[in-house]
């Protein structure tokens, strides 16, 4: 019998971690993963359903797999809208929602029974990873308790469920032992970690620690590898993490989605609504840890956003001088409460505001990177090509931030650290030579 499974993982890093866990279980049970639809006995698709374009990509992928294979199991965020999938592809074998690991594996068993003898010994202790060997995503919780009006994640993934502290730290330790040099800490709401457990005390390596964000960062920092924080909601206790960055325990990098600067828009989004307080906190973080890199994301064209309110966002951007910024045009996600707000912004105006926003941030980024010329930086080597080496500094997360380009040199390996001198820059990337 064919025990080969095709697997497609769509969406964000959090979905990628879900895929890794499903694949680890399947491999442990003797299944073989194959890269083509034609060779697979069944195809599993982990979908994204956050915005309309992601829904369409997921549906297109399902249709493609159905056309080329015909035996498809669907899971992930879009699985929460089974009727949407069934309407587009009525013959899929099984549909489940996000982080339904056991349900997916059981569905594979149903339509493609496992081999008689599992091959658990072939699975590395850290499990199967879909990232390069030198970095890995570490998911610390599921779900979210926030009620942001532009978002439907709580509907798809439920309320906050923090993973046990010992489980997270054990996984992190195994990843380090497997050669991982950088952990990217992720969840839907990273800084809420432990709230749902009431900060339960647990034993870890002979000492008592609390199930809370600060303690988790502190313990991860003791591993002695890069630890990078993503999706950090701006709760007041986030301020307590910055000294850990200053002291070198975790990377001086904070990914903190702010979404807007105008108080009326923020209230309509159900987000923290004081840009003045945010600017004061940013100044405080930089005073405590001058090397901190601040990344954020914003939404333009939110329903009712006026030109004056958008101009306030641009003014905030110029004053905050954030290092890394992403921008999204508001997308009316089905089921989001923001869709019911008055005065939707036209697509033309959204597009125009998006480009104005990115022009302002490009200039900020260009000037910040120019100031790094002549400095010495520690970089992590990501790729070695025929004519150049591609690396990242402490300021650069994979996939979403800039890169550091080096001339091809012998003796350098992927996944190693190197000391470099910055020699040039552009809007988003740096160029360097080895020390």
UniProtKB/Swiss-Prot annotation:
Keyword Signal included in the entry's annotation: no
Residues at which [4Fe-4S] cluster 1 binds: 12, 48, 77
Cofactor(s) needed for function: [4Fe-4S] cluster
One MF annotation (Gene Ontology) recorded for this entry: metal ion binding
Gene3D superfamilies (UniProt xref): Methylthiotransferase, N-terminal domain, Nucleic acid-binding proteins, tm_1862 like domain
Localization in the cell: Cytoplasm
S-adenosyl-L-methionine recorded as keyword: yes
SMART domains: Elp3
Main location, first listed in the record: cytoplasm
TRAM domain residues: 370-435
Role played: Catalyzes the methylthiolation of an aspartic acid residue of ribosomal protein uS12.
PANTHER family hit by this protein: RIBOSOMAL PROTEIN S12 METHYLTHIOTRANSFERASE RIMO, RIBOSOMAL PROTEIN US12 METHYLTHIOTRANSFERASE RIMO
UniProt similarity note: Belongs to the methylthiotransferase family. RimO subfamily.
Protein name, UniProt field: Ribosomal protein uS12 methylthiotransferase RimO
Organism encoding this protein: Legionella pneumophila subsp. pneumophila (strain Philadelphia 1 / ATCC 33152 / DSM 7513)
Lineage: Bacteria, Pseudomonadati, Pseudomonadota, Gammaproteobacteria, Legionellales
């Amino acid at each position: 019998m064919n025990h080969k499974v095709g697997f497609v993982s769509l969406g964000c890093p959090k979905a990628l971690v879900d895929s890794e866990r499903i694949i680890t279980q399947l491999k442990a049970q003797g299944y073989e993963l194959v890269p083509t639809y034609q060779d697979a006995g069944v195809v599993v698709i982990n979908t994204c359903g956050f915005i309309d374009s992601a829904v369409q990509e997921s549906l297109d992928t399902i249709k493609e797999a159905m056309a080329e294979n015909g035996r498809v199991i669907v899971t992930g965020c879009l699985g929460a809208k089974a009727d949407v999938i069934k309407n587009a592809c009525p013959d899929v074998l099984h549909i489940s929602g996000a982080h339904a690991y056991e349900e997916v594996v059981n569905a594979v068993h149903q339509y493609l029974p496992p081999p008689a003898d599992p091959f658990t010994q072939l699975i590395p202790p850290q499990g199967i990873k879909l990232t390069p060997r030198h970095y890995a995503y570490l998911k610390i919780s599921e779900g979210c308790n926030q009620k942001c009006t532009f978002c439907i994640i709580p509907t798809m993934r439920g309320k906050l469920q923090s993973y046990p502290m010992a489980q997270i730290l054990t996984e992190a330790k195994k990843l380090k032992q497997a050669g991982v040099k950088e952990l990217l800490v992720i969840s839907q709401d990273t800084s809420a970690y432990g709230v749902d457990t009431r900060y339960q005390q647990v034993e870890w390596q002979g000492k008592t620690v609390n199930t809370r964000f600060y303690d988790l960062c502190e313990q991860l920092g003791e591993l002695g590898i890069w630890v990078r924080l993503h999706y950090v909601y701006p709760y007041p206790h986030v301020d307590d993490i910055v000294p850990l960055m200053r002291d070198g325990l975790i990377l001086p990098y904070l990914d903190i989605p702010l979404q807007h600067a105008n108080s009326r828009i923020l209230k309509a989004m159900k987000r923290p609504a004081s840009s003045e307080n945010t600017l004061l906190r940013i100044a405080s973080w930089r005073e405590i840890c001058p090397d901190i890199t601040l990344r954020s994301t914003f939404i333009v064209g939110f329903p009712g956003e006026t030109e004056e309110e958008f101009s306030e966002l641009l003014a905030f951007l110029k004053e905050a001088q954030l290092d890394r910024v992403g921008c999204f045009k508001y997308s009316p996600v089905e089921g989001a409460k923001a869709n019911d707000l008055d005065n939707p912004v036209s697509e033309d105006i959204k597009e125009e505001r998006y480009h104005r926003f990115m022009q302002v941030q490009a200039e900020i980024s260009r000037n910040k990177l120019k100031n790094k010329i002549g400095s010495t930086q520690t970089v992590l080597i990501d790729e070695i090509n025929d004519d150049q080496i591609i690396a990242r500094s402490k300021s650069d997360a994979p996939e979403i931030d800039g890169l550091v380009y080096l001339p091809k040199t012998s003796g350098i390996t992927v996944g190693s650290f190197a000391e470099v001198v910055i020699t040039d820059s552009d809007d988003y990337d740096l160029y360097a030579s080895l020390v």
